[in-house]
Amino acid sequence: MQVALRLAAYPCEVMAASFNRDKILRMNRGRMPFTFLPMDELYARADMVVVLGGDGSILEAARRAAPRGVPVLGINLGRVGYMAELELGELDLLSRLFAVDSAGNPMWHTETRSMLGVEILTAAREVRASMYGLNDAVITNGSIARIIDIELYENGRLVTGYRADGLIVATPTGSTAYSMSAGGPVADPRVSCFCVTPICPHSLAARPLIFPDDATLEIKNICQREKMLYLTVDGRTNCELYRGETVRIVRSPLKTRLVRLRSYGFYDRLRAKMADYS
């Protein structure tokens, strides 16, 4: 609520999601005018989306904002908030959204982040489902901790097979999330790549791999013990992956634009956000 009140003091229209209407009206008590809209209409009309929450909330906002090219400003209410630009104690920096420097340039900018385009192909190579994500695509056995068998292909050529608990394909943005926890590399978002990280591989030789993001990656379910595996994109979208089916991953034409109010570099942010967990 205090974020909305801060923004309402500037020359802008503050729009809020309809599901927050009762809470905001109760706290606002008529002090400031707000426009309440359904989520789809909100994203269609917005020039910028301000998200209060953790990284999960920002991922959901990115999914909705990317098709419209709307920039996203994250304010951390979660634990790490790696993609968030501000903490609650830094709301004074919101003034930079409406300020210019001595040369007349805006005092904020956006970072463009690549996204994954993900499709599920049937055994007959027909597209059964498609989705996109900012962080990662994860193939696992679901809630049962049982090893799976999959094959990884790049541009139609077999790279390797895995016997593992699962496999993560991450963007540079997603390389600091689940992939990093599984022992994957941290990729600077200026690098155009996919990070492929096996989860608990049953092998002495299995290692994380990095591919250029103009490659087409395919992961085929060859597991004979299980009827189906599960594909999860950004921890939100969950689909069954049946035996003989394939997940195809490419660089999506969509981009996420993250609003930055400071000149922090990638490694400054990495140190600051991860310091409490090192």
Annotate each language-model stretch with its function:
Residues 123, 139, 155-158, 204-278:
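ATP/nucleoside-binding phosphotransfer catalytic cores, i.e., glycine-rich phosphate-binding loops
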Residues 60, 64-78, 82:
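Gly/Ser-rich helix-loop-strand patches that form or flank binding pockets
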Residues 79-165:
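Catalytic core of DAGKc-family lipid kinases
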Residues 51-55, 63-64:
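N-terminal glycine-rich "phosphate-gripper" loop used for MgATP/nucleotide binding
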Residues 24, 78-83, 185-187, 203-204:
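Short gly/pro/ser/thr-enriched loop/turn and capping motifs at secondary-structure boundaries
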Residues 152, 174, 231:
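Short aromatic-centered micro-motifs
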Residues 157-205:
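Gly/Ser/Thr-rich active-site loops/lids in small-molecule metabolic enzymes
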